[in-house]
């Protein structure tokens, strides 16, 4: 288990920010996050968040994905106090991180997001993964689907992707 103690990290805010669509709240204060071919369950506790992964997985992927080495507090402190608009935005979304997502996954989700709402986008992404993503297994033996590769989507054909 890895602990994140950072006041500028809030999974609920990140999940609702519209950056990614494979982050789900499965119980109060419990989140399942899928990124590329990776999965992690994260629980909120009184001190921050606990990631259900080992140090190696955290260092190789999740630390970078959540941009945890960037000091967001310093950006917030640098905002001119007289800029009420930016100050209010920073206070409202102080827990949002800029996710460092896989470029392919980000482009495809961006294209799907056009003229759609978050619920519909999540459904489209989930179906893409179910139909065209490679099978993966997490550390507990549970099976999930990776985000499909360009080759997998190209092989599906345009008609199949439209349905």
Where do the PLM segments sit?
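HhH-family (HhH-GPD) DNA N-glycosylase catalytic core used in base-excision repair
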Residues: 1-163
